[in-house]
Structures are given as structure tokens and as C-alpha cells.
């Protein structure tokens, strides 16, 4: 009887490990594939002991007893993160100001010296003027790291040329009388349409003032609105995330990653614009929020919409796609059913995982605990050094997005791991170490298809 039980357990482990090896091979994860195959070989040796060396069966019995204990420990539920379940307000410890869009490095690089907007901003932030002056001259996404490889750089330019065209039609006024429909039904339709158009994750929230910019300058405009009068923003936001290709992202910091960034920003501008005009046709206001037109900060808005949590790398981390997403949204006054913020153990996992910080080529990601910044607890990135590296390589890097353990493909195997991290007391503590063992601690660029290969 013991022999049969041990045989079944060991055979099951062999099959699981071979499945892991196959999945790792498909993901171009050679380190994980070899680790899985070596583990499978160990279990083949155990099978030999079980079947042909009865005097040594105490070894597999002890091994599976320890394995069973580990499984039981993994099944101990963790305590919920109450701050995460509150949303962005759960991390407020002071009186946070509303965000100024000029605090975003890529936005303020477009400030023109001698204008009132320039003088007013650097009067308040003199420490940023000189470093911004240097970086402003270098600000580019031109594929320097790949020698400006034209096919890929042209992909980047082509995709980023789309959002400016969408900007002019971002605001959609009601075209008809409001359609008589319940909030429940309208929410189902809006989410379904957004999914159909290409959004992989969709959520709804009330627009929190902490997400609304005070000083706006959309990326493609030439003038700022400086401390202007308060505008009445629609109360609801439909927030959408499109998926960044796993293959493209794992080529970071090379040009395929930047090409995919442009592609998903273009997709987001299209989806949000279509959704804005759908709300318009339903008799309500729709304002598309995308890389060509921002009124709000999208990551915290997505947190409010129950789409994920903000990780150590500063990105929104979603339950199924991790950091591999780009965000867009629509502000509307159409009554919708709001989602609640979620807790997927990101904070606890990131506290035990330094992978993004350790591999960041510009050391821009903190290795410390969350600290207070503008009245909220957060992992504050060094945006200036991050941007300087972008300028150096001529892409948007994305190594931190790619190496994040949450960013693995949405497969059954990784789904089980995500479920355990979300529910287990032990998993967020030990799985960062397991990820290092299986996938390695250091960043390694993965191969890309021939049509994306920058190496002539």
C-alpha cells in the first residue's frame, strides 16, 4: 500500500515537473526549464528507490512527508491588507496635494524656458532645473542601444503617431437624450465593449480628486493651464488595461519593448476614444484619457477601479498580467456600478522581493520600505535617473516590468502560483526566493522572432 501511494505521488510530481519544463521552454525560460528537468530527474531516481529498493523507502517517505507539511503551511490563509482594500486613501498619512502633471519627467521636459509656466514651476522646484535642462536636450526614443535599427524605430514612431490624432476627439459631448438604462446593465455593456475592443482588464470607479491633475499639459499641446479654475469632471471612470506582449517586453531594454509600448498606447487611445463616443451616443459625456490626452493619473485610478495594486516598480500590478499592461480610461457622467479596490498581496510580496530594484540599470527603484511622499506612503522611484537611462539607450527600458514575477504569462501554471500568493500566509514570503531559484536573479534578454530581431 505504501509503495502504491509513493508511486502515485512521485509519478504525479514527475508529470508536473515535465509540464513546468515544457511551459518554461515555451516562455524561453531556459533556467527554469533546466531546473524543472533536474527536479524531474531527482524524482525518477526516487521512483527507482520506491520500486526496487524497499530498504531505502524511508527516504521518499520522509521527502513526501516534508512536502506535505510544506503544502499544509502554504494553505494557511494570510490576513487581508486592509490598506489595499481601501484603495489609494488607505495609504494617506497626511494632507496630500492633487498631482501636478509637470511633476512627471516626460511632461516637464516640454516646458519652454522664458514662459510663465517654466518660471513658475522651477521657482518652486529649483533643484530640478539644471538636471532637467541636461535631460531635455537628450530626451528621445530613437533606439540608440540597437544602433537606431530603422525597422523597429519606425514601428515605435508609427505607433506613437496615433494618439495625437485621437486627442482632438477625446472629448465627446452627449449627442442625444440620455438612454433609459440601469447602471447594472450599462456597466455590463461598457465592460463588454471595452473587452471586445481589446482591453484585457476593465474596472469602474468614482473619480477621486487625488487622481485629477491640477496643472495639465497633455503631451502634444504647446500651452499649459496654470492654476486655472476648477473644472467639473464627470464622476465616473471606466479604466482599461491592454496587455503588453510577453515576448516584446522580455527584449528590454531593446527596441521591441518600446515598439510594444507605442503599440499599446495607440490601442489605448483608440479604445478609450471609441468608448468615449459610445457614452456620447448613449446621451452622456465621455472624455478619453490616454497618452495623448491626460486629465487624470491612471495607475491610482486603476487601483480605485479594482484592477490591481501599485508595486515596488511603480507600475500597476494586475492579478493575471502583472505589470505588463498599459492603461487608458474614459471619464463619464453615465451612472455605473463601481468596483472595489482589491488586495492581491502585492505589498507583502514586494516587501520580500527586490528583483526589480536589484536589476534596475539606473538604480532608480528603492530597496527600502515604503516612505512618505506628498502625504502618502509609497515606493518612490527616482524618475530623473530612470529617464536619464531611457535617454541613454533610446528606449523605455521596461526591465522592471519584465522581471517582475507577477508578469509571467497568464497560464494555468502561473495562475496556481498567483492564487497561492494571493491567499497564502507563506507564499508571499518564500515565492520571491523560489522565483530566483527557478528563473535566476539577474536580467537576461530573451530572444525575439526574426521580424523583431535588431541584430542584422
Residue ranges and their predicted role:
Residues 1-2, 316:
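Membrane-helix boundary elements
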Residues 2-247, 254:
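Non-catalytic, usually N-terminal nucleic-acid engagement modules in DNA/RNA processing proteins
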Residues 28, 301-307, 442-444:
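Glycine-centered secondary-structure boundary/capping sites
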Residues 153-179, 311, 316-333, 452-453:
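Amphipathic repeat-derived elements
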Residues 200-422:
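Catalytic cores of enzyme domains
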Residues 2, 6, 10, 14-17, ...:
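Flanking helices and flexible, charged tails adjoining ferredoxin-like Fe-S electron-transfer domains
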Amino acid at each position: 500500500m505504501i509503495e502504491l501511494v509513493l508511486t502515485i505521488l512521485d509519478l504525479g510530481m514527475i508529470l508536473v515537473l515535465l509540464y513546468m519544463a515544457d511551459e518554461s521552454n515555451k516562455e524561453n525560460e531556459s533556467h527554469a526549464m533546466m531546473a524543472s528537468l533536474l527536479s524531474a530527474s531527482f524524482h525518477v531516481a526516487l521512483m527507482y528507490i520506491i520500486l526496487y529498493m524497499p530498504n531505502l523507502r524511508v527516504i521518499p517517505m520522509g521527502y513526501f512527508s516534508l512536502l506535505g507539511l510544506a503544502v499544509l503551511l502554504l494553505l494557511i490563509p494570510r490576513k487581508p491588507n486592509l490598506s489595499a482594500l481601501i484603495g489609494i486613501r488607505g495609504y494617506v498619512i497626511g494632507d496630500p496635494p492633487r498631482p501636478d502633471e509637470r511633476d512627471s519627467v516626460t511632461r516637464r521636459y516640454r516646458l519652454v524656458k522664458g514662459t510663465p509656466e517654466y518660471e513658475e514651476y522651477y521657482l518652486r522646484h529649483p533643484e530640478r532645473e539644471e538636471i532637467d535642462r541636461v535631460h531635455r536636450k537628450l530626451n528621445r526614443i530613437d533606439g540608440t542601444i540597437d544602433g537606431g535599427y530603422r525597422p523597429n524605430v519606425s514601428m515605435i514612431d508609427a505607433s506613437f503617431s496615433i494618439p495625437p490624432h485621437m486627442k482632438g476627439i477625446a472629448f465627446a459631448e452627449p449627442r442625444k437624450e440620455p438612454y433609459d438604462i440601469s447602471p447594472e446593465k450599462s456597466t455590463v455593456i461598457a465592460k463588454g465593449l471595452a473587452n471586445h475592443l481589446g482591453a484585457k482588464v476593465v474596472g469602474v470607479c468614482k473619480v477621486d480628486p487625488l487622481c485629477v491633475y491640477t496643472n495639465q499639459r497633455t503631451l502634444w499641446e504647446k500651452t499649459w493651464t496654470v492654476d486655472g479654475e476648477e473644472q467639473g469632471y464627470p464622476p465616473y471612470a471606466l479604466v482599461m488595461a491592454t496587455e503588453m506582449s510577453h515576448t516584446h517586453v522580455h527584449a528590454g531594454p531593446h527596441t521591441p519593448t518600446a515598439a510594444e509600448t507605442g503599440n499599446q498606447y495607440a490601442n489605448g487611445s483608440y479604445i478609450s476614444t471609441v468608448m468615449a463616443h459610445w457614452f456620447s451616443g448613449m446621451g452622456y459625456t465621455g472624455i478619453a484619457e490616454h497618452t495623448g490626452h491626460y486629465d487624470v493619473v491612471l495607475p491610482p485610478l486603476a487601483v480605485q477601479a479594482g484592477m490591481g495594486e501599485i508595486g515596488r516598480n511603480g507600475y500597476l500590478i494586475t492579478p493575471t498580467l502583472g505589470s505588463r499592461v498599459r492603461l487608458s480610461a474614459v471619464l463619464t457622467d453615465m451612472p455605473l456600478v463601481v468596483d472595489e479596490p482589491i488586495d492581491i498581496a502585492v505589498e507583502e510580496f514586494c516587501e520580500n522581493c527586490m528583483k526589480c530594484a536589484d536589476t534596475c540599470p539606473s538604480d532608480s527603484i528603492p530597496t527600502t520600505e515604503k516612505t512618505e511622499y506628498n502625504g502618502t506612503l509609497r515606493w518612490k522611484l527616482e524618475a530623473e535617473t530612470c529617464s536619464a537611462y531611457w535617454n541613454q539607450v533610446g528606449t523605455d527600458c521596461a526591465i522592471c516590468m519584465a522581471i517582475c514575477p507577477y508578469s509571467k504569462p497568464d497560464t494555468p501554471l502561473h495562475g496556481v502560483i498567483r492564487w497561492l500568493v494571493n491567499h497564502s500566509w507563506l507564499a508571499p514570503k518564500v515565492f520571491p526566493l523560489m522565483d530566483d531559484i527557478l528563473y535566476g536573479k539577474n536580467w537576461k534578454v530573451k530572444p525575439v522572432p526574426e521580424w523583431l530581431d535588431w541584430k542584422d
